[in-house]
């Protein structure tokens, strides 16, 4: 879909459809009031007959409104004017895009950016509208013989009433389009079936990205290299699979100083997780193809970074692996020596993601990172704690935690901080090794974060548990692309602060 911004007088706008807001009690927004004046009261007469009350998300499509140059006018209910917040605005945009897709309009002129949303500016309103519109038009039908009929809507133009906001509005378009494309890339990768998307497939996507841009280099560590390095925890997880474990490294150099310390993003890439010997229940095991959503997120973010040419040095790691049941599988009771030299007693082979990540987090020390963020569908406990709306976050550095929280608020892609206190570390005590790979049943998301923190003492680090936010299980099944938007916003913020 194409998006544009412009500033012009309403009466001169020619479009297949004009979109304007109406508040509760049939109170016009500024643009709706202008439309009513141009139509000589035609719209207000319709509303007085009860056609639209103005409740949030209500829509009324009008055809051939007198003296209006556009064929259609779409009025959208915006609720009470003083209570218009982020949540309601998103609902308004969702209902608007859905209605436009049903009108048969190829393009539309949207005036909803004039709405005053609590605490939000025009940049935010446009960017959110772009991301939402892209998301609503997303389909994954790669493996369907009969494809869905594509939406007719091809272009949305946002009309800006204040010309001084044109520059920031164009920036919002640029960011929104890039992030939406990154979200789509992450969703496409995560939605791939596990018989196709294995570690080698992730590696091919890394090389594909490198071949597309001179600022990107890709390299892959295979089983033999990891064995020589001593990445025994990582390798143990994949030793029951016929698919080789591969760690793909995507290096982007955008900083003017090539020696500037990089930001490293680590994505858990379990392309399928059976649970291993501690096998998962068969119900919904098919969803365990989504256990690589962390790697898909990193891939999507790297696509955004490339699109925006961010002036940063960034390394993305796709920690590819598959946890399967076999006579060669690792077992409960095994003791593994990690790359860091610390030993881990395996109590549960379904707590495998942290074993892959712990060696990866040690490996990336060689890059002398400024910041490390790992993204992982790590624990069901995080879903119990935070549901499907918030990503769990733990960090060993409060300023980093605050930066991520701020980026999440800006992007509307929310996270919630969890503690990393010593009391939880005691849950990992082992009688025969330095630690166990699981704690007790209580606070499982936190003990998993505590486990990872033991491998991150040499840099500032944050852990994002996306088990509850990475994919939908019921309505609109499939990957969500979260938290691509939040991480992209974090990197945009960083690029601004680092280059002042």
Curated annotation (Swiss-Prot):
GO terms for biological process: proteolysis. Keywords: Aminopeptidase, Cytoplasm, Hydrolase, Manganese, Metal-binding, Protease. One of its GO terms (cellular component) is cytoplasm. Mn(2+) 2 binds at residues 268, 273, 291, 352. Belongs to the peptidase M17 family. Mn(2+) 1 binds at residues 273, 350, 352. Pfam families: Peptidase_M17, Peptidase_M17_N. The active site is at residues 280, 354. It catalyses: Release of an N-terminal amino acid, Xaa-|-Yaa-, in which Xaa is preferably Leu, but may be other amino acids including Pro although not Arg or Lys, and Yaa may be Pro. Amino acid amides and methyl esters are also readily hydrolyzed, but rates on arylamides are exceedingly low; Release of an N-terminal amino acid, preferentially leucine, but not glutamic or aspartic acids. PANTHER family: CYTOSOL AMINOPEPTIDASE, LEUCINE AMINOPEPTIDASE-RELATED. It comes from the Bacteria. Its cofactor is Mn(2+). This is Probable cytosol aminopeptidase. Binds 2 manganese ions per subunit. One of its GO terms (molecular function) is metalloaminopeptidase activity. Its EC number is 3.4.11.1, 3.4.11.10. Its main location: cytoplasm. Presumably involved in the processing and regular turnover of intracellular proteins. Catalyzes the removal of unsubstituted N-terminal amino acids from various peptides. It is found in: Cytoplasm.
